[in-house]
């Protein structure tokens, strides 16, 4: 099956990009539990990362600062690892779709 390439606007926010990720995840048939987990994780991430920032301007430093905030708030390593794992899946999807 041919892949449909869609060009994304350079000013797409992290939040908008995540909604695209969720739509794709839903269309691929991921379980409701997985989708709910992604949403919960993104909600937590959004408390520590400016999700209205254009995704094209997201830097490694932004992510490191987010993780540092989580550590300052005494989140467990398990929680932090869960949130970063969700971000890794999100970024992998963006890369696979060639929209990073």
Stretches found by the model and what they are:
Residues 2-5, 19-33, 39-100:
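N-terminal core-binding DNA-recognition domain of tyrosine recombinases/integrases
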Residues 6-15:
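A detector for short, charged/polar N-terminal pre-domain segments
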């Amino acid at each position: 099956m041919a892949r449909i390439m869609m060009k994304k606007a350079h000013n797409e926010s992290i939040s908008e990009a995540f909604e695209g990720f969720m739509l794709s995840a839903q269309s691929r048939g991921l379980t409701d539990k997985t989708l709910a987990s992604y949403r919960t994780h993104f909600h937590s991430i959004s408390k520590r990362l400016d999700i209205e920032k254009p995704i094209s301007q997201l830097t490694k430093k932004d992510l490191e600062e987010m993780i540092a905030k989580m550590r300052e708030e005494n989140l467990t390593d398990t929680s932090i690892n869960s949130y970063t794992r969700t971000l890794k899946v999100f970024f992998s999807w963006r890369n696979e779709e060639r929209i990073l």
